[in-house]
Amino acid sequence: VKNDKIKLVFIASLGTLLEWAEYTFYGYMATKLATLFFPTDNDSISLMKTFGIFASGYLMRPVGAYLFGRIGDLKSRSSALFWSMMLMGACGLGIGLLPTYQTIGFWAPLILLFFRLLQGISVGGEYNGAGIFLTEQFGPSHRCLAGSFISMASAFGMVFGGLGAYFVMLPDMPEWIWRVPFLLGSLSCFLGLWLRRSFLAASSVLASTLPPLNFKLFFKKFSRNFFIVFSIGALTGVFVYVNNVYFVVFLNKQVGLLKHEAILIVVFGEALAALLIPVFAWYADKTGPTKIYQFGLIMAVLFTPSIFWFAQYGDTTNLLVSQCIFAILNALISAPMVYLVVHLFPAHLRYRSISIAYSLGAGLFGGTAPMVAEYLQTQYEWIGGIFYPPGIYVCFFALVTWFIIRYNAAKIEYFKHPGQ
């Protein structure tokens, strides 16, 4: 039974790992992709356009959340996870083979946008769906730990995406090498499909036979819970993408590190976070996930600015301290997060409700976070020290989310059993 659980965690988490690896690789490669698909005389404009396409994928996540959420609620969790990974692999293959602007002109960024939109749809059904699936498979005493494996997979995905970008950015690499991680990711998706088809179907919680609520009744009963998941999605997206994807740009442009050096520093922080997440999740199962999550939010408000403050000095010691702070904050927020959102809705509405709410928050605010951070830093670059604008932007979201959780903690109706 233990081996089956390990296999279940690996196969369910694989899609999330690949999804975040590809998203992170695209974010880290924004400067390179800007020159290939948006060649202009102004590097900042090209970079903003590339981050804009990054954001467009996020904005399609609610569409995927509804489509795959409907499959997950009305058919089975495993079916939704299978088809979301299928779409993800096809899009990665398309981007990996896509000609650049120099070859096909304005069609290149248009086709890139098309694939990113489809990827956004696939992501809308993957991350939360995998978290729901795993949480429903484990007993009450380990559900926070079970959900944390999805957060850990996303962190390791960012590590692999970062390492891919690091090798691509090394001097003397051939021009076409940026395609390889996309193609390898696509191949991994198709291999993962075979594993999912043969294993997850045997473990899947079948959809409830209860009829779905109409929207009017749904928002009358669950509007509070929906808004909580929305805010958690927004905070998670902003925190991760400002302190990770944008942070590479910050280290490169503001601190003066070479791009591949900046990526390696951030990869260290993500790897440490991935290792800490299950530890904090295990502790959250013992003490209560809501307490751990609120504590993590307060720590994020207090210490996120110090991530930028230590990094500004540019020496190895301060950079590593910066990433240790990021890793601890990331793990505190990520460890209990999946458990919290999964238990806010009954089983027959869970996949759609969580995926749509989380995707809306992450799409509107997380997906646009690198673009907003770049804009704030450009407009207010005279502000430095402990008050770097991107760090303050993260603090604002952490504080707002803390108030929302704190105010509603005693008023939330939880659905603790998968069958409820």
Predicted regions and their residues:
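C-terminal ends and interior cores of transmembrane alpha-helices
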Residues: 86-105, 299-314
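Glycine-rich segments within core transmembrane alpha-helices of 12-TM secondary carriers
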Residues: 122, 144-166, 188, 355-369
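Helix-to-loop junctions at the C-terminal end of transmembrane segments
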Residues: 63-76, 276-289
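Cytoplasmic helix-loop-helix junction between adjacent transmembrane helices
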Residues: 109, 113-152
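Extracytoplasmic gate region of multi-pass secondary transporters
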Residues: 27, 224-273, 366-370
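Cytoplasmic membrane-interface "Motif A"-like loop-to-helix N-cap segments
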Residues: 74-86, 286-298
